UniProtKB/Swiss-Prot annotation:
The lineage of its organism: Eukaryota, Metazoa, Chordata, Craniata, Vertebrata. The modification Phosphoserine is found at residue 160. The keyword Isomerase does not apply. Residues 13-91 form the GST N-terminal domain. It comes from Mus musculus. The active G-site contains a dithiol Cys-X-X-Cys motif which mediates glutathione-dependent redox catalysis. Members of this family may change from a globular, soluble state to a state where the N-terminal domain is inserted into the membrane and functions as a chloride channel. The redox status of the active cysteine in Cys-X-X-Cys motif likely determines the capacity to adopt a soluble or membrane-inserted state. A conformation change of the N-terminal domain is thought to expose hydrophobic surfaces that trigger membrane insertion. This is Chloride intracellular channel protein 3. Belongs to the chloride channel CLIC family. A motif (G-site) lies at residues 23-26.
Amino acid sequence: MAETTKLQLFVKASEDGESVGHCPSCQRLFMVLLLKGVPFTLTTVDTRRALDVLKDFAPGSQLPILLYDGDVKTDTLQIEEFLEETLGPPDFPSLAPRYRESNTAGNDIFHKFSAFIKNPVPTQDNALYQQLLRALTRLDSYLRAPLDHELAQEPHLRESHRRFLDGDQFTLADCSLLPKLHIVDTVCAHFRQLPIPAELSCVRRYLDSALQKKEFKYTCPHSAEILAAYQPAVHPR
């Protein structure tokens, strides 16, 4: 990347109109850029008001939006792929996971969570929660199973102690899953008094490890932002 290249990321603003708001896709790309270590400008956009800041180059587009030397990119997955391809070694770290399974671990959790938390029929709550719990348990099993490189170092290792999906390094897989997993834990704990269970110790360790990672902690919206976003969709119990 040329030294004069300009990178600008537009993300959803919080209720105060300035800090980072509730938008897992925005947090995902924000983390990618921080992990790459590339200079960029972050612009928070108040979506409740006229999007004057976007009208000249991305009218009608959904956030997040990347502006790369004047070139507009609006699809989150395509932006992520573009950044990984453009900002690669030796100048920037690769964030691609080593293991293909890391890319899909936990990918059904958010769908199960949405069905549970937005369910209008109380008698269906338990069945929907059990589906969410099974999805979380599958993630726990993946995080518990030693990866090949761990077994190469410790052939008799029975349980992984890694911090993240693919090892001890944050990857694109974590950038995708963790913002959503944090929402699941925050929203279920507040509205249903059902945080991710302590028995799923590897998932809890995973979340705790994320909160110790400055790139995740710094990009997280306040819990109040997340709860306010879900308040209209959650039926009281």
